[in-house]
Structure formats: C-alpha cells, structure tokens
Amino acid sequence: MRIISGTFKGRKIERPKDSKTRPLKDLTKESIFNILTHSNKFKINLINSKVLDLFSGVGSFGIECLSRGAKKVIFVENYSNVLAILKKNLNNLKSNSDYKIIKQNIYDNFFFNNLEREFDLIFLDPPYKENKLEIIFRGIKDNEILSENGIIIMHRHKNEEEILIPGLEIIEKKIYGISKILFFSFLK
C-alpha cells in the first residue's frame, strides 16, 4: 500500500500482518479520489477540507486526504493493534499536518455528541457484515456532523445490502472487484 498523490506521494503505508483488517486497496482508493475530483454530481474540494475517517484502520484514506491538502483529518479506530500501526504511519510522514487520533467505539452513545462538527467528507470503512450502520448515519445526521454540502463515502462488500435511511440519498455507487463504494448525502 502506498500514498497515491500529493505531498506524500509514493510513501508506503504499513498494514497489519493478520487478515482480519482489510485496508483499502490502492486501485479502489485511487478510483474514489478520481470520483471526488471529477464528479458532476457533487463538489468536494479536498484542499482545506475537514475529513472524518471512521473505522480508519491503518489510516490509508485519511493519510491520502492529508497528502492531497486536507486542512484536518480525524482518525477514529478502536482496535489497539491497528491503532499502533496507524500512529506509526502518521509519524512516518514527519509532517506538521493537522490530525487527531481518537480511540473509541463508534457505537458509544456519546461518541457523536462529543465530536467536532462540519466535516466536508466522512469516510466509513466498517468491517464487512457490520449491521449497526444505521446508528452511525443517525448519529451523523442528528448531531449535524456533516457540513451542508458534505459527502459520506462508505466502503462495503459488493454483496452487502444497501442502507436505506429516510433523508439519506445514494449519489453514486461503484463496484471494484469485491468492493462496493457508496457516496451519500443527506437530503436538504
């Protein structure tokens, strides 16, 4: 795994040796950023954006955002073994980029209450077969975590069911191998 573009282009991102963690593949990540850059369905300018990386794992998505000029990235991960690799990956950047790491269970009742607001981009990469995603989307909406024109991107297995929540719209959907990438926004 590597950083694809921007300030840290070409740098490697370490990943865990076990197979329980499935970091975002470079090709899928590159496709996501191409859509973010060129889509006519929404406008996101990564430069100076504020990004929330939920289930961040080793930080591949959030680090790519920092490399491409994001103003701030908040990484949220709950598993200690993966968290150690995330910290190492960020330290290896030797950068004064603005980022924060939060070790917390996202399903904690107070997680979204205590989180910053107005994220331009929220990335979700939950474990496959995760069935509590409605809690996350409701937390984001009820606590106004996403900015008015913000986008939520979710990485899922291609065979997983769509998430249907009133007021949540799928803007774009792409399949890459076994991965499904969904782009969401809340209806205004």
Annotate the PLM regions:
Residues 1-188:
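Class I S-adenosyl-L-methionine-dependent methyltransferase catalytic core
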